[in-house]
UniProtKB/Swiss-Prot annotation:
Pfam families: K_trans (PF02705), K_trans_C (PF22776). The gene is kup2. It is found in: Cell inner membrane. Keywords: Cell inner membrane, Cell membrane, Ion transport, Membrane, Potassium, Potassium transport, Symport, Transmembrane, Transmembrane helix, Transport. It comes from Novosphingobium aromaticivorans (strain ATCC 700278 / DSM 12444 / CCUG 56034 / CIP 105152 / NBRC 16084 / F199). The chain crosses the membrane at residues 15-35, 55-75, 101-121, 142-162, 173-193, 208-228, 252-272, 303-323, 351-371, 381-401, 408-428, 435-455. This is Probable potassium transport system protein Kup 2. It is a multi-pass membrane protein.
């Protein structure tokens, strides 16, 4: 019993350390810029003590309400068979509502689109903020911003180019490095709190309320900047499938939250001390890079190096999250198939998506070169994250109501304060659209357009194919009446509709005048759950002695391997002659009477034409595939 308990504790400690290295990388690097930017918004007419304490109070209570209460305590319980994140919640809400609510799909698509807007900003802002710390090192204070940008571009380019090799070999370092990072955050904070203990009054929420009331519109701009302290909170639920609820909660409550709180208090204490010194000589206090100047000169260079490593790890977590979200979106039918490569033979889920990788790199570098400083870029950050949080909260209401069967009134009373706060933050960030907030909105809009076009185009194409198709039962009856030449072996015809004869089967009969001894009409179905148990994978319905219909069911996080799963199903792939897979490849053409707007058809044609090969996506060896073409007019 003691051995089991000890093993369980070791496993919990290991998972908690892993969560600290992956889940909290984004929110853990916020002290680099969050307090500085929030105070900068408040200090347009000079900094006073009430503004320092007020901004700090807003930051502390944002961590308490948004991260601790909403995400760690409430939303972490809302998982889809252990998986979290906006698309997992969408899939769970679809199951809860029977899949018939279009609003659920729209919410999920909106959340996913906003995530990509956030994904290009996080690496750019965090790495650039760390690189700007170089100017605080004695002797490097004259370093130009152009040189800082060059260093940032070099680090980011190297990071994205490294992705194709996978991160399994270095991932074990993420936890220890971030552990040191959070210890440094806490240590620096404690050191400065002792110089101005009155900073602890910021725990009184009246300071936050008074600040907002007294500063009017300026208070809303400050609130938008304060939100930078909680960016990255979505990762707490998005990574539940990797680490589990308890390690994530334990890591936050016992380590990360205290470290962040102490560091923000330390930055506030340093600002109060600097304010007292400035007032003593009759000078106004200018805003500063409070995080880096917390460290003494001799430790400034090591702190910059540590901050750079922490931001690289945070960026890696966002990149990996983008791969994972894209994989889920493809499985759930929101995006066309993209090339996916496994980067580890031993660890599931270690994937690399070259298309996503290079698009992210292009966006990240454009941001760095366009905004040129972390302060300018910070205005663009919050709007995508707040939008995602609004979507998540709305999804939480649907799940609590429809899936947990809570009373709608009580559910609304619980969710309403969280939604009100999310909308308040969202409104505060909307004010900064002209300062750069338009960038993530533009990215989200483009991704949303792709998702909407793919959903609409694919649904329309499937409907047209069904209209033009022939009933499978009628085809089987016709083959009984006029039997073609039989050849040994098994033919597997992939289809989207089991009631319609696959076009590949019709073309095979037309051109080859032959039919295999055994024929399987197969549909691959993606369930609204992350995983499907192997024993529930295959569902078979026999039509006659030579034809059967089969469903292969996968979760949206499962790795699809059609040949292996068919081979494991008793009695499917039998007899001599081997197995051939017939895939219909449809070409989209303009119809004489179009059913979609022309621009949408053009975009859908582009997406359809550039989608990854379905045989690779289904793990079917190319030497066992026969492709037969058809045309669909839209």
């Amino acid at each position: 019993m003691q051995t089991i308990t000890r093993t369980s504790r070791n496993s919990l400690a290991s998972l908690t350390l892993g969560a600290i290295g992956v889940v909290y990388g984004d929110i853990g690097t916020s002290p680099l810029y969050a307090f500085r930017e929030a105070l900068g918004q408040a200090a347009r007419d000079g900094i006073v003590q009430a503004e320092i304490v007020g901004v700090l109070s807003l930051a502390l209570w944002a961590l308490i309400i948004v991260v601790t209460l909403k995400y760690v305590i409430f939303l972490s319980r809302m998982d889809n068979n252990g998986e979290g994140g906006v698309l997992s919640l969408m899939a769970l809400a679809q199951r809860a509502t029977g899949g018939g609510w279009v609003a659920v799909t729209l919410l999920g698509a909106t959340g996913a689109a906003l995530f990509y807007g956030d994904a290009i900003i996080t690496p750019a802002l965090s790495v650039l903020s760390a690189a700007e710390g170089l100017k605080t090192i004695p002797g490097l204070d004259g370093m130009s911003q152009t040189a800082i940008i060059g260093v940032t571009v070099g680090i980011l380019a190297a990071l994205f180019m490294f992705q194709s090799r996978g991160t399994a070999s270095v991932a074990t370092l993420f936890g220890p490095v971030c552990l040191v990072w959070f210890v440094a955050l806490a240590g620096l904070g404690l050191w400065h709190i002792a110089d101005a203990p009155e900073v602890l009054t910021a725990f009184n929420p009246l300071h936050a309320v008074t600040f907002l009331v007294s500063h009017g519109v300026t208070g809303l701009f400050v609130l938008g900047a304060v939100f930078l302290t909680v960016t990255g909170a979505e990762a707490l639920i998005a990574d539940m499938g990797h680490f589990g609820r308890r390690p994530i909660q334990l890591g936050w409550l016992s380590f990360v939250w205290p470290a962040l709180t102490l560091n923000y208090l330390g930055q506030g204490a340093l600002a109060l001390k600097a304010l007292a010194a400035a007032e003593a000589i009759g000078q106004p206090l200018a805003n500063a890079d409070w995080f880096f100047i917390m460290a003494p000169d001799v430790l400034r260079a090591p702190l910059v190096i540590l901050a750079t490593l922490a931001t690289i790890i945070a960026s890696q977590a966002v990149i990996t999250g983008a791969y994972s979200l894209t994989h889920q979106a493809i499985s759930l039918g929101l995006l066309p198939r993209l090339t996916i490569r496994q980067t580890s033979e031993h660890q599931m889920g270690q994937i690399y998506m070259p298309g996503v990788n290079w698009l992210l790199l292009g966006g990240v570098l454009l941001l760095v070169l366009g905004f040129k400083s972390s302060s300018a870029m910070a205005a663009a950050y919050g709007i995508a994250v707040t939008g995602t949080m609004v979507v998540t909260t709305c999804m939480a209401f649907l799940i609590a109501w429809k899936y947990w069967n809570w009373e709608p009134v009580w559910t609304a009373l619980l969710i309403a304060p969280f939604l009100a706060l999310d909308l308040f933050f969202f409104g505060a960030n909307i004010l900064r659209v002209s300062e750069g907030g338009w960038v993530p909105l533009l990215v989200a809009g483009l991704v949303g357009l792709v998702i909407f076009t793919w959903l609409k185009g694919r649904r329309t194409a499937l409907a047209r194919a069904s209209e033009q198709g022939v009933s499978l039962n009628e085809t089987v009856m016709a083959l009984h009446a006029r039997p073609p030449t039989r050849i040994e072996g098994t033919a597997v015809f992939l289809t989207q509709d089991l009631d319609v004869t696959p076009s590949a089967l019709l073309h095979n009969l037309k051109h080859n005048k032959a039919l295999h001894r055994n024929n399987i009409v197969l549909k691959v179905e993606i369930q609204a759950r992350p995983y499907v148990a192997p024993e529930q994978r295959v569902v078979v319905d026999r039509i006659d002695e030579s034809f059967l219909k089969a469903r292969l069911r996968y979760g949206y996080m499962d790795t699809i391997d059609v040949p292996s799963d068919l081979a494991r199903a008793d009695g499917l792939l039998v007899g001599p002659g081997g197995t051939s897979f017939f895939v219909g490849r449809s070409a989209i053409r303009f119809a004489a009477r179009p059913v979609l707007p022309r621009w949408m058809t053009v975009v859908y044609m582009f997406l359809h034409r550039n989608a990854a090969d379905p045989t690779a996506y289904f793990s079917i060896p190319s030497n066992r595939v026969v492709e037969l073409g058809s045309q669909i007019e839209l």
